[in-house]
Every structure is written in C-alpha cells, then in structure tokens.
C-alpha cells in the first residue's frame, strides 16, 4: 500500500493557506477523489456517481467547497452541496441518498485559522484506509478533465438540514417527549448552529440557544464543548435543567446539569450504556487509553466487556466493529451508538442521554448512580527529540513501583505527546493525593 502523506486519522487537516489546506490542493484532491470514485462506481445505472459536500462555518469553507466541487466535476462526479451541516449529517445524507461518498470540510474543534477535508464511504462510515491510499496515489497523476458530455454537475440541496433534523428526532423514542424540560444548547458558532436548537425544540423542550451566531471567525471561540464553563454559566443564569455543548462540527458532546456541574464523555457514555442495559444485554463498550479508570471498574461490576483503543474516534470504531459491539466513545465527548448512527454524533448522543433521564425520571447525577470517576493527575515532562523514553531504566523502575503501590486502586498511563516535545505522565487513583504523589514519583525518575 502507498504510504499516506496527506491523510491523517481524520482526513486532511492543517492551517488555511498551508501546504494542503489551500485552493490548489483542494482542486487536486477533488479531482483525485473523483477519479477513484469514478473507477469504483462509474457506469452504474447509466448515471454519473454523486457525492455530497457539507461544511462547518469557517470563512475558508467557501473557498475549499468551490475548489473541491470543480475537481470532482472535472472527474465526472455530480456534486450535492449541503451547506453548513454537522459532520454526522453528511454521513447520514450519504447513506440515505445512496451516494458514493460524502465529503466534510471542517477542522472540528480547532480555531478558524485551520480547516480540513474528510471523506465518508457510501455506508456513512469513515473511508477505508485502502481507498484513502488510492486517492493519495491519484494525487500524483496530472490534473485533467473528462469530455464535456461527461462533466459532473453541482446543485445546492434545499432540505439538507431538515432531513437531518428529522433523522436525529427519529432516534428519540416516540413515547417520550421533552415537554417541560429547559435546555441551554451551545452550538459553538459551528455547523449545528441552526439544526441543534430545532431538534430539541421540536421534541418539546424549552430551548435557549447560545453559540448560534457564526461569522466565519468565531467557531469554537470561548464556547462549545471545549469551553463548557460558558454553558454552565448560562444554565445557572437561566435556571435550566440541562445544558448541551457541541463542538464546531457537532460530533463531540459535553453536558451540564442544573447545578452547573459538567459531565464529560465517559460519564455520558455510562448514562447511555446503563439505559440500554435496562432494556437488554450490552455485550461490551470500547473506550480509549484516556477513559477514566472508574468507568472501567464500573463496566467490570456490571459484567460488560470493556476494551481500550488508541485515542481517536477512528480507532474506537475499529475496535467496535472488530468485536461487534454497539457502543463506544472518548472522554472528550466523541460518542458512538451504532444502533442509532454509523458515526459519532453529538446531537444524537445527547438525545440518548435524555432518553435515559426521561425514562428514569431522575436528574443526570442520580442516573449515574454508582459511577465513581477517579481523580487524575497529569505531569508533562520535557522530552528531547529522539529520546527513547521506553528504554529509560529509572522510569521503568518507578512505573513498576507505582503500579505496585496502586494495586487495583488506580492506573498509570505514560505516552509521548503527538503535538509537543513532552512526555505525558498520567496517574488515576482513588484519592487526589495518591494520584499526585504517584505522578510526582514518575516525574522524579526522569529528573
């Protein structure tokens, strides 16, 4: 397989105007992807293959959308332009409209200066590695154009948001509603700025929306799932029962209760799993290396299988598919319920939590019941480039000693940062003081 140069774990991403996130590269990428899709799907039923393009609210989305559209059309692919919609909406539209692929223009939780391009398969799932490799290889081919009679056409969808709103609502039980529930919805000035408030209002909730005034530059700025403290303030000020925070492309969720307490992805995943267990058996759940130790212990107590994947929703999904499990997620709020959707979806995940609370008729804190999140201590230690920390004898000895000290009362995670020259030393333990002292022992071994 060709080594991937441009595609990371979540498509192509970078700073606007940089090596890959620019108009010229987007044109080439659209043409390369179109060539691959035409080879795979061309000639079926005598019609041209179709793809859908959705985007978030960054100012650069217009430029990248136009360039991708031109490249795809030059390769003989018809293009549906969905406009600003959440990433999971593109996955849904791709599958529902029987398209050959979906394309998302978004850098998720990053600031507006960044953007990205990622693909969904015809099944509404992340594009397989081998197809991404084919597209990478096609990027090295000369930019061309099919004959005029075979050129693709583009048109704007008029009902993309409405279709997705109805799909989200369909994942909430028909015998329940949100009448009488006061909810603050924070859409991070991102892709869900219009659809998210509509979903919860149409189910009966009294909704106050914040983060719904995108200007091309304010996406994720002090609002959304990365800044749930803004939501917590709004919930307390409004006297709301709950708050729902999404990130820029609405595939990430954090929630807040009426007291302003913030709940992360581990706690929300537990809420969903517990509700599903009230209706039947849950075979297993996939978390990540960062999933709290308390979540793992609670899964063990409930007799539910638990596996840790590498950090990244792509890896969570791979583990879920390998084991045939339906539920998985990350502490950051990427939550996947394969009995509802083919990808992580912040709005749908929130609806599953609300299902649990309406069925149980209890506040979120009470629904979490016996779940005890373990205190965490993280220390970042500078790491010189090229350092082989895995072979460091002092760190290895300290790790063994700390793990013996914890002995079922916590865990140790040591990993190099993917973005900075640092080694991250993380300890979770029953008590904050124990977590701190163990982390400091690990750090001291590297001094």
From Swiss-Prot:
Gene3D superfamilies: Alpha-D-Glucose-1,6-Bisphosphate, subunit A, domain 3, Alpha-D-phosphohexomutase, C-terminal domain. GO terms for molecular function: magnesium ion binding; phosphoglucosamine mutase activity; phosphomannomutase activity. Its cofactor is Mg(2+). Mg(2+) binds at residues 108, 247, 249, 251. GO terms for biological process: carbohydrate metabolic process; peptidoglycan biosynthetic process; UDP-N-acetylglucosamine biosynthetic process. GO terms for cellular component: cytosol. The modification Phosphoserine is found at residue 108. The keyword Phosphoprotein applies. It catalyses: alpha-D-glucosamine 1-phosphate = D-glucosamine 6-phosphate. Pfam families: PGM_PMM_I, PGM_PMM_II, PGM_PMM_III, PGM_PMM_IV. Keywords: Isomerase, Magnesium, Metal-binding, Phosphoprotein. The active site is at 108 (phosphoserine intermediate). Its EC number is 5.4.2.10. It is an enzyme of class 5 (isomerase). The keyword Isomerase applies. Belongs to the phosphohexose mutase family. PANTHER family: PHOSPHOGLUCOMUTASE (ALPHA-D-GLUCOSE-1,6-BISPHOSPHATE-DEPENDENT) (PTHR42946:SF1), PHOSPHOHEXOSE MUTASE (PTHR42946). NCBIfam families: glmM (TIGR01455), PRK10887.1 (NF008139). Catalyzes the conversion of glucosamine-6-phosphate to glucosamine-1-phosphate. This is Phosphoglucosamine mutase. It comes from Bordetella petrii (strain ATCC BAA-461 / DSM 12804 / CCUG 43448). The gene is glmM.
């Amino acid at each position: 397989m060709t080594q991937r140069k441009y595609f990371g774990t979540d498509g192509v991403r970078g700073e606007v105007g940089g090596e890959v996130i620019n108009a010229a590269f987007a044109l080439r990428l659209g043409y390369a992807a179109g060539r691959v899709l035409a080879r795979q799907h061309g000639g079926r039923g005598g019609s041209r293959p179709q793809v859908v393009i959705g985007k978030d609210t960054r100012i650069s989305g217009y430029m990248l959308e136009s360039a991708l559209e031109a490249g795809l059309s030059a390769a003989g692919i018809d293009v549906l332009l969905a406009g600003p919609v959440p990433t999971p909406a593109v996955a849904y539209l791709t599958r529902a409209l029987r398209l050959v692929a979906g394309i998302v223009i978004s850098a998720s939780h990053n600031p507006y200066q960044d953007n990205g391009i990622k693909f969904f398969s015809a099944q509404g799932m992340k594009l397989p590695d081998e197809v991404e490799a084919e597209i990478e290889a096609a990027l090295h081919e000369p930019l061309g154009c099919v004959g005029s009679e075979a050129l693709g056409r583009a048109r704007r969808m008029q009902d993309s948001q409405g279709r997705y709103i109805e799909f989200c609502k369909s994942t909430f039980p028909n015998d329940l509603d949100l009448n009488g529930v006061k909810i603050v919805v924070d859409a991070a000035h991102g892709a869900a700025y219009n659809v998210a408030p509509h979903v919860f209002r149409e189910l009966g909730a009294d909704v106050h929306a914040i983060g719904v005034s995108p200007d091309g530059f304010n996406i994720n700025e002090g609002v959304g799932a990365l800044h749930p403290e803004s939501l917590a303030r709004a919930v307390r000020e409004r006297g709301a029962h709950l708050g729902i925070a999404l990130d820029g492309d609405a595939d990430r969720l954090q929630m807040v209760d009426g007291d302003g307490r913030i709940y992360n992805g581990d706690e929300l995943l537990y809420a969903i799993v517990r509700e599903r267990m009230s209706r039947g058996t849950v075979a297993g759940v996939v978390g990540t290396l960062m999933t709290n130790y308390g979540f793992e212990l609670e899964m063990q107590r409930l007799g539910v299988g638990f596996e840790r994947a590498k950090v990244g929703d792509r890896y969570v999904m791979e583990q879920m598919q390998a084991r045939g499990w339906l539920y998985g997620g990350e502490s950051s709020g990427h939550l996947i319920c394969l009995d509802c959707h083919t990808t992580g979806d912040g709005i749908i995940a929130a609806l599953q939590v609300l299902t649990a609370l309406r069925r149980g008729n209890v506040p979120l804190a009470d629904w979490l019941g016996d779940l005890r999140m373990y205190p965490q201590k993280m220390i970042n230690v500078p790491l010189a480039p090229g350092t082989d920390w895995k072979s460091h004898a002092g760190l290895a000895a300290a790790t063994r000693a700390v793990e013996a000290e914890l002995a079922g009362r916590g865990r140790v995670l040591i990993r190099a940062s993917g973005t900075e020259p640092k080694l991250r030393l993380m300890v979770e333990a029953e008590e904050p003081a124990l977590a701190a002292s163990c982390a400091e022992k690990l750090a001291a071994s590297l001094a």
